[in-house]
Amino acid sequence: MSIAAVILAAGRGKRAGSLPKKPKQYRLLGQEPVICHTVRCFCQNPAITTIILVIHPEDRQICEQAIADFKEQLIIVEGGNTRQKSTLRGLQALRKFKPKYVHIHDGARPFVENKLLEQIHTTVTPQEGVLPVLAVCDTLKRINSTHHVLETIPRTHLYSAQTPQCFPFERILAAHEKAIKTCKKEFTDDSAIAEWFGISMRTIPGSPHNIKITWHEDLNTAHLYLQKKMQMFPDIRTGNGYDVHSFEEGNSLILCGIKIPFHKKLNGHSDADVALHALTDALLATRGAGDIGTHFPPSDPQWQNVSSEIFLRHALDIVKQAGGRIANVDITLIAEEPKIGPYRHAMVGNLMNMLTILPDRISIKATTNEKLGFIGRGEGIAAFATANVLYPGEIPK
């Protein structure tokens, strides 16, 4: 069964009080922009084969920065000046992929759960779309222009609609094209267009956590829920890494991505950054994803002399795609020389940028080997690294 998704992120977020050039979908939620949380669940679901992300034309740069970890899995399409036009452009971009079904989802709903997607997948049919809903619990009042109550509306059989909403692809595409052609603009969601077009919609229970960030207060609520979610499922994983490289003739070496003037350099297939190699292994260990040699074998000439930041960013991609949040990292460098102290601040700053964590979560220490062994003889540098990463999900029993 071929399933695609259109994620709508072209809005300007005026109701959420967006900062200049910072719509709500690009605001930070925890350590990542809202849109990263939104796309992750779709990217991790194996049944979803194609994902279209519809953005505002002015947001391409900020979007590409925000979704860098998922760029290989997303197709970016520029939207129109209304939600309806943006949705149509996303659907039209899917036409060449010919999916059987398509999810349409609000980019400002960051807490889609995989179990909801799975329930949708087992419910949707060529004849019926699927709509997650929640029963209305509050008492509803109709008021007039002077803010006086006109009547109380019975809430029996009233439900609020959520996304993702899933449809037979060809039928919802035809519905949107007809709506634009006939200038029908009064729809507030895609299920309304489906109803108008004659597509039957089956409802399933939504999730109270699947909130849409519309107002500024919603972002505060999302922060609280994210914190609670991570506390409820404290899957804290610790990974360790070790690496060592010998010296050879040279005039500088690289540690934590920082060039250090020295009368020798480190010998290695890449730039021989022993610190980043150890840290890469530590991060990979938190996912049981092998080691640096598994992903970047030294026998492969394409990795010769490349920056070790490439290796670290690859490990970070693996961590982030699993929803991991780095709690802290600790690196110990063991060498008789050069002196590390003068470069420690620059090293921490470089790791801050790569790991997107605060400096108090980065420890870089250096020690000698008291003149013992090959390190004591000044023949090379060794590094130990430890990474603690918090992942969502319960610890297996």
Curated annotation (Swiss-Prot):
Where does the record place the region 2-C-methyl-D-erythritol 2,4-cyclodiphosphate synthase? 237-397
- Give the highest taxon in the source lineage: Bacteria
GO molecular function annotations of the record: 2-C-methyl-D-erythritol 2,4-cyclodiphosphate synthase activity; 2-C-methyl-D-erythritol 4-phosphate cytidylyltransferase activity; metal ion binding
Q: Which reaction does it catalyse?
A: 2-C-methyl-D-erythritol 4-phosphate + CTP + H(+) = 4-CDP-2-C-methyl-D-erythritol + diphosphate; 4-CDP-2-C-methyl-D-erythritol 2-phosphate = 2-C-methyl-D-erythritol 2,4-cyclic diphosphate + CMP
Q: Which UniProt keywords apply?
A: Isoprene biosynthesis, Lyase, Metal-binding, Multifunctional enzyme, Nucleotidyltransferase, Transferase
Gene3D superfamilies named in the record: 2-C-methyl-D-erythritol 2,4-cyclodiphosphate synthase, Spore Coat Polysaccharide Biosynthesis Protein SpsA, Chain A
Q: Name one Pfam family in it.
A: IspD
* EC number from the UniProt entry: 2.7.7.60, 4.6.1.12
Residues at which 4-CDP-2-C-methyl-D-erythritol 2-phosphate binds: 243-245, 269-270, 291-293, 367-370, 374, 377
Q: Which GO terms describe its biological process?
A: isopentenyl diphosphate biosynthetic process, methylerythritol 4-phosphate pathway; terpenoid biosynthetic process
Entry keyword annotation includes Metal-binding: yes
Regions annotated as coiled coil: none
**What cystine pairs are annotated?**
none
Q: Where is this site: Positions MEP for the nucleophilic attack?
A: 155, 212
Region named 2-C-methyl-D-erythritol 4-phosphate cytidylyltransferase: 1-236
Q: Which pathway, per its entry?
A: Isoprenoid biosynthesis; isopentenyl diphosphate biosynthesis via DXP pathway; isopentenyl diphosphate from 1-deoxy-D-xylulose 5-phosphate: step 2/6; Isoprenoid biosynthesis; isopentenyl diphosphate biosynthesis via DXP pathway; isopentenyl diphosphate from 1-deoxy-D-xylulose 5-phosphate: step 4/6
Role noted for this protein? Bifunctional enzyme that catalyzes the formation of 4-diphosphocytidyl-2-C-methyl-D-erythritol from CTP and 2-C-methyl-D-erythritol 4-phosphate (MEP) (IspD), and catalyzes the conversion of 4-diphosphocytidyl-2-C-methyl-D-erythritol 2-phosphate (CDP-ME2P) to 2-C-methyl-D-erythritol 2,4-cyclodiphosphate (ME-CPP) with a corresponding release of cytidine 5-monophosphate (CMP) (IspF).
Record's protein name:
Bifunctional enzyme IspD/IspF
